[in-house]
């Protein structure tokens, strides 16, 4: 039996995201049963396996997992074989993987890779940027605040790749794009459920700014946004199902033109269309609330379902990029 237990928390109960990853030395031709004990938490992430050290992943069949009536214990049947297996709640996307992806994007599209700070563990915090210093507008997108949220990272990558491949030169001439692919490298490197190494959920620290990663990112984004019209602010995450958290549409303190354009794109291009939830955690220290209060932009949290299929992930990322491009083109000169 393995006990799946969260990292230390200094701010109350941790979000129930019982993430796990481990290596299993089977060395048997027969299947092996393993129990995952979540103690006071519940089974959430279906296991995937890799036989090639994470280069490729296969989701176990539905009959390979049995969850107890109370959800606290899951019995997993692992296939036999001569070699060891990696087992994880989602296919792993490590900081090294994300660094390789970032480097490729920078090289392909002539972006700049900017180190804007250092995490609590001393890891570099990086942004990918493109667009002239004289640009009057800016688009900001980020991901990687919560370690297990792989589908959100995947959608962000589609968004970034589509944006860079398709943004017109005339739009790029007056728009700066700032992309943050990994806000919480410590949590991801340590395999945490939710927090950084300081025991805090970084997406509740944007107003207090008690953690080095959030101090650095808020300072950097404020500098990038100074004197510019912040057109869009997107933060990609994962949760139980695909949805979008947004400021209240009916309140006039933020321009909701881009959120409405994105909603229209999702409604027309995805079936069923994602739910939009206005005013969620309106007082919490989330990135979207910081963006609203500090940058005067309606920050959006785009949540992908934990088990969103590749086609849905691709659609969310691509449609988000197209919505940004179309909105920038339509509002140029305003």
Regions found by a protein language model. Give the residues of each.
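Well-ordered mid-protein domain cores that form the structural environment of catalytic cofactors
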Residues: 63, 111-114, 326-331
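Extreme N-terminal flexible tails
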Residues: 1-81
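Extended acidic/polar, glycine-enriched regions
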Residues: 67-110, 114-117
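Active-site-adjacent mobile loop/cap segments within catalytic or ligand-binding domains
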Residues: 92, 203, 244-252, 278-334
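Short Gly/Pro-enriched turn/cap motifs at secondary-structure boundaries
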Residues: 11-13, 115-119, 290-292
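Short, conserved catalytic or adaptor-binding loops enriched in Gly and charged residues
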Residues: 103-108, 170, 192-194, 290-294
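A short, polar/proline- and glycine-enriched secondary-structure boundary/capping micro-motif
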Residues: 42-48, 97-100, 152
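Active-site/substrate-binding loop(s) of hydrolase catalytic cores
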Residues: 112-130, 135-276, 299-306
């Amino acid at each position: 039996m393995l006990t799946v237990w969260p990292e230390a928390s200094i701010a109350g109960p941790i979000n129930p995201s019982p993430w796990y990853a481990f290596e299993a030395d089977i060395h048997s031709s027969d299947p092996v049963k393993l129990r995952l004990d979540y103690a006071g938490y519940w089974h959430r992430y279906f296991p995937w396996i890799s036989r090639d050290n994470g280069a490729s992943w296969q989701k176990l069949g539905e009959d390979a997992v049995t969850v107890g009536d109370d959800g606290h214990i899951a019995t997993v049947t692992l296939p036999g074989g001569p070699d060891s297996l990696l087992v994880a709640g989602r296919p792993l996307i490590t900081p090294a993987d994300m660094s390789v992806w970032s480097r490729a994007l920078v090289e392909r599209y002539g972006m700049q890779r900017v180190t804007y700070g250092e995490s609590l563990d001393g890891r570099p915090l990086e942004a990918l940027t493109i667009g002239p210093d004289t640009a009057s507008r800016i688009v900001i997108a980020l991901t990687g605040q919560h370690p297990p949220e792989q589908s959100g990272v995947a959608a962000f990558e589609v968004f970034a790749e589509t944006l860079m491949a398709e943004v017109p030169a005339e739009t790029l001439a007056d728009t700066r794009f700032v992309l943050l692919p990994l806000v919480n490298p410590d949590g991801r490197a340590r395999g945490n459920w939710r927090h950084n190494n300081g025991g805090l959920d970084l997406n509740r620290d944007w107003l207090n700014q008690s953690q080095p990663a959030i101090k650095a990112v808020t300072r950097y984004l404020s500098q990038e946004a100074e004197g510019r019209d912040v057109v869009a602010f997107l933060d990609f995450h994962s949760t139980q199902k695909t949805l979008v958290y947004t400021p209240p549409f009916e309140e006039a303190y933020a321009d909701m033109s881009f959120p409405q354009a994105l909603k229209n794109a999702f409604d027309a291009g995805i079936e069923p269309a994602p739910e939009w939830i206005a005013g969620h955690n309106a007082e919490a220290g989330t990135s979207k609330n910081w963006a609203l209060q500090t940058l005067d932009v309606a920050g959006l949290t785009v949540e992908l379902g934990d088990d969103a299929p590749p086609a849905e992930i691709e659609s969310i990322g691509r449609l988000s990029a197209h919505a940004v491009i179309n909105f920038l083109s339509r509002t140029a000169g305003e």
